Amino acid sequence: DLCLGDPDWMPHPVIYMGKAISALEKFLRRRFPDTQKGLLMAGAALAAILPLGSFLMAAAAIYLAGLVHPVLAFLLETLWCWQALAVKGLYTESMRVKKKLEEQDLPGARSAVARIVGRDTQNLDAAGVAKAAIETVAENFSDGVAAPLFYLVIGGAPLGLCYKAINTMDSMVGYKNCLLYTSDAADDTPCVD
């Protein structure tokens, strides 16, 4: 991942997880009452369905690929292990911020850090830009490198993709609403940070 990153032309599991989260959220909102208890139950259902589904689909695909040829199973698992990590993107974006700060290009540094943080960067001074970048790199290293690597080591691509599903739920809807309170809590449980 550090050498190649995630090529734009290659389908990425997180994109499909995101689509599944959006579809499941809509489906579950229609099926559960619009009360705090109903939304928590829907959140619990989503927090169970997506990670378990990601794990089972990956495990089944690798198993079926192995029936065709063991090398095919190895290649598929290798591809998904690669896609579960986010080393190059994190490195590239953080170095862009560093370069702009070294050039004393504060507007450029603000713009660069805005690509990796989820907050307003327009009023940050140089120290604020550096702090935002450091905080984001620390969190994203945990979410994009350390935790996925941990789960890949103990459970291969299926468990690595299960973790990515949990993390993607948290990123998309974990802080947005009551429905995904459970997804936010699920993201905090498997982290190794």
Per-region residue spans from a language model:
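A residue-level signal for conserved active-site and pocket-lining positions in enzyme catalytic cores
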Residues: D1, L24, A109
